Design a protein with these regions (language model features):
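Beta1/beta-strand and adjacent pyrophosphate-binding region of the FAD-binding site
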Residues: 1-11
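Glycine-rich flavin
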Residues: 2-3, 19-26, 31-154
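N-terminal Rossmann-fold NAD(P) dinucleotide-binding loop
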Residues: 14
């Protein structure tokens, strides 16, 4: 399949560049091996901020009397529930990236890219399967194979 632009990596730089290229009328694809949105969205900044927000709420509850409030009973936390909430927030944002790419008619090609010649990428199955929060890859999507592009962005 031939593209005007192929972008290797669906992180914050890759997916934004892909959307803009598509908006400018270029046939665009993104090769992603693991999860759209990159490390920050899926495993770093966003999940960490969700955990910090839970800690902040816990701290407010511990100091409820400072606000003229009373909490009866023991205050505690559930680390599993905190993690589930954090992952859920990341998954929601991850699916938003997928929606934006689809809305802008950007093809997502699942796999690991290798540039084999100028203007040609070979995509192989990822060394490790996609991990949550990425939804399972639907049947019929682009993946393993050879792709040509006028421009390749890494």
């Amino acid at each position: 399949m031939a593209y005007d632009v192929l972008i290797v990596g669906g992180g914050p730089g890759g997916y934004v560049a892909a959307i803009r290229a598509a908006q400018l009328g270029l046939k665009t694809g993104v090769v992603e091996r693991e999860h759209l949105g990159g490390i920050c969205l899926n495993w770093g900044c966003i999940p960490t901020k969700a955990l910090l927000r839970s800690a902040e709420i816990y701290d407010y509850a511990k100091h409820a009397s400072d606000y003229g409030l009373a909490i009866h009973g023991e205050l505690g936390f559930d680390s599993k529930a905190l993690t589930i909430r954090s992952r859920k927030i990341a998954a929601q944002l991850n699916s938003g990236v997928g929606f934006l790419l689809k809305k802008n008619k950007v093809d997502v090609i699942w796999g690991e890219a290798t540039i084999v010649n100028p203007g040609e990428i070979r995509v192989a199955p990822p060394k490790k399967p996609p991990v949550q929060p990425q939804d399972p890859i639907p049947k019929g999507v682009l993946g393993e194979g050879s792709y040509q592009a006028t421009n390749i962005i890494i």
